[in-house]
Amino acid sequence: YLNQYFRESYLWSSLHHWNSSYNLLNPKRYKKGFHFVLTAQHVADRGMASTYLVSKGEETRQGIVVYSSPADDIAVLFIQEKFRNIEPIKYRPMKSILEVGEPIAYSGYPSSHKLMSIRGRVAGYEDKHGSGQQIILHTYGWFGCSGSVIFNKNGEVVGVLWGVDAEYYPSLAIVEDMIWVVPITKLDIKKPIKTICK
């Protein structure tokens, strides 16, 4: 049930020659009827107030960047004209970092594939310069999954997927079952909402 619920909110955008993944969310307790897209900053990196086209099926809408953090790799886009056939997920962020061994689920557009739903577990944590503690998942990911929102078993937002692990010795190799996620605790949702309400 949760996988289907999540899939309905996933959007797609073709950026940087790869698919990119987005989630349509609605923080109802902050502003009724306000819809935004949560993604990775590196797939929406043209700066504040820049615009991107995001799609689901035959519907396409324009998203405006209202929050951008290169250090944490999180971006928030404001959707001015609502989608007609997509119901946004209620934004329920975790208040703490998910523990090792806990299950997760997400959907995304790896490589040139259509929407895929993937499960996994928290494997551990690493530090990222400028951002601090990151979540490492034991799951599957590939280029194009960047920006996917990770959910726990209760449907709460865990964080945003921003990278696939890599091995540099003795040669470069992508480790597609070790995935980097920035915890949602890094995002203060009041900041993008304040930008919109100015």
Segments (PLM) and residue ranges:
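Active-site region of chymotrypsin-like
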Residues: 1-17, 80-88, 114-197
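Short, conserved secondary-structure segments in the cores of folded domains
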Residues: 22, 92-96, 140, 146
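Conserved active-site neighborhood of the chymotrypsin/trypsin-like protease fold
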Residues: 32-107, 112-115, 131-134, 191-197
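Catalytic histidine site
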Residues: 1-51
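Short, solvent-exposed loop/turn motifs
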Residues: 20, 59-60, 157
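Conserved beta-strand and immediately adjacent loop positions that scaffold enzyme active sites
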Residues: 21-22, 28, 51, 73-75, ...
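A glycine-centered beta-loop-beta connector
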Residues: 28-35, 101, 150-157
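Short amphipathic beta-strand and strand-loop transition segments with alternating hydrophobic
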Residues: 24-28, 64-66, 126
